Amino acid sequence: EAAAAPLPNHAAPRGKAGLEGFDGLAEALGGTVLGQPDYLQKLVIALKRPYVMGREGESARNAFLVTGPADTGKHLSLCAAAEELARRGVFVSGDISWMDLSLYPTAAEEKLFLQDLYMALAAKGDIVVFEHYERCQPAFLTVLSNLVQRGKSPLAGRYVLQNGRLVDAGNALVTDAVGALTPRGKYLVLL
């Protein structure tokens, strides 16, 4: 069986701070995201959960859905939370990987989707946000569902890593074929 894509060196260790890094976080975010105290408290709970409950291996640290009307601070709150948690030493980086799933409406975009997903999961930040899931090819949503529910999503073909990118191996015999993707300990957020 082919292995899951290996972790880049920067993705293995996460920030050093633990639960104490979340103290007063909702209040701090309230200075940036105005008028949303209940939402910010729920966001902090979602981000804090894996530090309370724990997690195994490369499974997602947590997966959650952020909903609400346009222009209510969803993007801003995620960015502010990531930056503040990085500043506090909980996250290694304040970066967020964003994937617009409306770019993959048909099965013809499979290779592009897998490449973009791999790059998002391999990025330095701790959060991957998936936007416009309702406009995505349903088969690709199954990949995301597997990442959330099983902690791994098998790939239909075999891939190899070349210069940090997943490349279809076709029928080539390769020693380090990638047969699955893992969440790599990231937060997976549907927006």
Question: Language model features by range: what are they?
Answer:
Residues 1-20:
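Extended, charged/polar low-complexity intrinsically disordered regions
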Residues 19-62:
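Pre-Walker A (pre-P-loop) alpha-helix and adjacent loop at the N terminus of AAA/AAA+ ATPase modules
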Residues 55-98, 145:
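Walker A/P-loop
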Residues 58-61, 72, 91-92, 122-124, ...:
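Short loop/turn elements that form and flank the Walker-type P-loop nucleotide-binding site
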Residues 60, 156-191:
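AAA+/SF3 P-loop NTPase mechanochemical coupling elements
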Residues 77-78, 110, 122-165, 187-190:
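Conserved AAA+/SF3 P-loop NTPase catalytic/coupling segment centered on the Walker-B
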Residues 93-126:
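Short glycine-rich substrate-engagement loop in P-loop NTPases that contacts/grips substrate
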